[in-house]
């Protein structure tokens, strides 16, 4: 009996019971959970990747905003398994309520629009809690700090707290931090390479600004974002402003539809001002997928791709 009691005590000490309730921040709002959610819906491929990294599939009853925009990878499909897609793009309240979720993990312009049908306030009225993607908070709170990799780290740690997986979340962040340090040590000293990210748009380019995690990723890879002074996360600027900065390197976003990155490059090569920039003339670019450039686990490998491509001078 004494041996059994000792074994029980040692097991209890090694695996402490995680205390609930827990309270976390969501764009300045405090959200309290009395127990881990059991019926979460996740919007967008990058946020689904966060949930999958913490192996939360058993607590998910749906995803939204996947097939309407992207072609997924075989790995994503395997990890998603039989979790249904409730809406191919932005969900309606009807889509969500029908799944009877207790949590919606989304963001502003990542499944929700300010003043729209689906917001934390309208969901709360239905008994559904919301965790808002930190990168997107800038759309309602102009006092946010400039982008850093904490946008990813903090969201994963928060998700771990909510689901009682703090240790697993911390292990992920520690591993990513170590990888980033290795990348940092590989970046040559000297002036940062001028980088332009081209997402979409012909009359005006849609790109990453001061509060987008992509700006922090570019910096971690040894570059500087030529549109990094835009007071937004994602937005539009002018071709003239981009060309005046004379980017030396391009990141082309490949949504896996149409002609992808090659089509973007062809457009830039035919453009009257962008065709004169060093990056376009030398065809120095790397093509990356959406989930690599929005907050999610794929960011880390993407930073390494950018760093290697910049050093190599071309994709």
Segments from the language model and where they lie:
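Solvent-exposed loop/turn segments at secondary-structure junctions
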Residues: 46-49, 66-69, 103-104, 109-113, ...
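A short, structured surface patch at a secondary-structure boundary
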Residues: 42-99, 103-104, 108-112, 226
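Short helix-initiation/N-cap motifs at beta->coil->alpha
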Residues: 26-28, 83-94, 114, 230-239
């Amino acid at each position: 009996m004494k041996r059994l009691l000792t074994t029980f005590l040692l097991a209890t000490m090694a695996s402490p019971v995680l205390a609930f309730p827990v309270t976390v921040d969501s764009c300045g709002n405090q959200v309290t959970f009395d127990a881990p959610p059991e019926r979460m819906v996740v919007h967008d491929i990058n946020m689904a990747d966060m949930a999958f990294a913490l192996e939360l599939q058993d607590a998910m009853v749906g995803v939204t905003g996947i097939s309407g925009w992207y072609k997924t990878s075989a790995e994503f499909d395997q990890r998603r398994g039989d979790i249904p897609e409730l809406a191919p793009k932005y969900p309606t309240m009807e889509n969500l309520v029908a799944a009877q979720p207790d949590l919606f993990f989304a963001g502003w312009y990542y499944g929700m629009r300010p003043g729209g049908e689906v917001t934390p306030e309208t969901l709360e009225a239905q008994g559904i809690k919301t965790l808002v993607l930190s990168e997107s908070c800038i759309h309602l709170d102009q006092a946010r700090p400039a982008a850093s990799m904490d946008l990813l780290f903090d969201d994963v740690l928060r998700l771990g707290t909510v689901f009682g997986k703090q240790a697993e979340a911390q292990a992920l962040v520690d591993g990513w931090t170590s990888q980033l340090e290795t990348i940092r040590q590989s970046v040559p000293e000297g002036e940062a390479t001028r980088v332009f990210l081209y997402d979409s748009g012909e009359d005006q380019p849609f790109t990453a600004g001061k509060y987008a995690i992509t700006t922090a990723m570019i910096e971690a890879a040894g570059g500087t974002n030529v549109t990094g002074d835009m007071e937004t996360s994602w937005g539009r600027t002018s071709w003239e402003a981009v060309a005046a900065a004379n980017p030396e390197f391009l990141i082309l976003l490949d949504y896996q539809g149409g002609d992808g990155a090659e089509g973007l490059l062809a457009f830039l090569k035919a453009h009257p001002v962008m065709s004169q920039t060093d990056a376009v003339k030398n065809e120095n670019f790397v093509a990356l997928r959406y989930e690599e450039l929005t907050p999610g686990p794929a960011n880390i490998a993407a930073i390494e791709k950018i760093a290697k491509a910049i050093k190599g001078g071309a994709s």
